[in-house]
Amino acid sequence: STRRSFIKTAALGSVAVALPAFSGFDQLEAAAFNKAIDENNMTDVEKLHIPKVTLPPVVEDGNQAPIIVESDHPMEEDHYIKSIQIMNFNDPVVIKGQCFFTPKSGQAYVSTQIRLAGGESRVWVVCDCNVHGKWAISKDVKVAAGGC
C-alpha cells in the first residue's frame, strides 16, 4: 500500500512538472483524489476528510494571499490526518506548502500566506488520511495585482 501510494504520488508529481500549463490539468488532478460529490451536502465521511479552506475569492497582493486550512478529523493513534498540501497548478511553483501531522498534533490546522501568480487560478488543498487516503477541495481565486 505504501509503495503504491509512493508510485502514484511520484507519477502525479512528474505530470505536475511536465504539464503545469495544460488547460485540463485541474480535471486530471481532481481524478487522483477523493472529492465531495456535492460540497453543499457532504456525507459524514466527506465532512471528516475534506478540509475547510478559507481563502478570499479576490486577493489584492499575490505575494501575500492568506489561507487557512483546518480539519475536524479526529487525531487518534490509528486514524489521523498525516498531511495537508496546498497547490496551484497555474503557478511556476506548484506546491505552495505542505505540513505534516501526528496524532500528538491534536488538530490538522494550517494558517499561512502563499504566493500566487496574477490572474485567475484554482488553489487545491489535499488532506491525507492514514486510513482513507487523500481528500481534496479546490477554491477559485483571482489575484488583482502582483504575484510570483
Where are these regions (language model features)?
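Short acidic/polar inter-strand loop motif in beta-rich domains
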Residues: 130-136
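Extracellular Ig-like/FN3 beta-sandwich strand-entry sites
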Residues: 118-122
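C-terminal segment of N-terminal export signals and the immediately downstream linker at the start
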Residues: 20-53
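N-terminal secretory signal peptides and thylakoid transit peptides that target proteins
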Residues: 1-15
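Beta-strand signatures of extracellular beta-sandwich domains
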Residues: 83-87
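Exposed aromatic-hydrophobic patches
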Residues: 109-115
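Short edge beta-strand/loop segments characteristic of extracellular beta-sandwich folds
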Residues: 66-74
